[in-house]
Amino acid sequence: MRGCGNFLASPVLRKLEKGLEQIIMKHITDFHTHAFADRIYERAMQALKEGSGIEPFHNGSLAGLLESMDQAGIWRSVVLSIATKPEHADVILDWSLSIASERIIPFGSVMPTDRNAARDVRRMAAAGIKGLKIHPYYQRFYMDDPALDPFYEAVTETELVLVSHTGYDVAYPEREDLATPERTARVINRHPDLHLVAAHFGGWEDWDAVERYLLGKPVWLETSFLAEMCDRERARRMFLAHDPARLVFGSDSPWVGQKEELARLRGLDLPAELMEAVLEKNAASLLGNEAGIT
């Protein structure tokens, strides 16, 4: 067609392409990312890099995360922080409230073992935070410890989403059994209405136990590392064995590239309806589609 080349290079077509990209981006949520405040991200990332031996994919700042999201075609990210002392809860809450936006969904964090944990959970919910992050290794607790039941009950009552690290942890080579799939199963058995999202598909490098204790159970599984660390057929089988309404995409950015993790997920050749649920619908059902603070 005469003049077609000029049209393909025209500002009108570029605008149409940009609009299509925005439509695509608007639906994908990354349920597992990390970022730090501008005044501490360099120091925090250096310490974490030394502890894990992993080279990050961006600098750990909020700007770095947003740039990564743009490159990957991701519209929203859940930003997860971890309180390693009770007093960190307020600092994390204040920062979370300051960064929340249509594209950034910050979760709070409390020390589950602290005597005021249940009170802090209710305070987070009252402030409009949509969820919390806990990490049995960094916060030093067994996930199924009955002493944590008041904490889990408060999370359930406030209808917050709870993301927990599950499985082993690369920074702890001694492989303590703090967050095994079996322990996670005990938590959901005691608290069946808890909106628990088990990071790393329910058990980083403990995939046999994930299949034994968690697949098909009432727990949300976040997808990071499964497609990278398992062979393709096993990863695909595990996806298909779980409730399709309880799977959410996560990358663990900046320790994994968001674009790369999306490519690995797409490489599993999952049914289109399941992919839509994992990337879009299930996160929307947990978080809603509005901005990051309610």
Task: Report residues per predicted region.
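Acidic, Ala/Val/Gly-enriched low-complexity intrinsically disordered segments
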Residues: A9-V12, E17
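Mid-to-C-terminal alpha-helical segments outside catalytic/metal-binding sites
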Residues: S10, E21-H34, I40-R76, A241-V248, ...
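Conserved, mostly hydrophobic/aromatic
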Residues: H32, M69, S96, M124, ...
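A cross-domain feature marking catalytic cores of carbohydrate-active enzymes
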Residues: T33-A35, S81, G108-P112, I134-P136, ...
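Active-site environment of divalent metal-dependent phosphoester hydrolases
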Residues: A35-R39, T84-E87, T113-N116, Q139, ...
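Active-site gating/metal-coordination segments in enzymes
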Residues: W75-R76, P86-V170, E174, L178, ...
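Catalytic pocket-lining loop regions of alpha/beta-barrel enzymes
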Residues: K130-G131, D144-V248
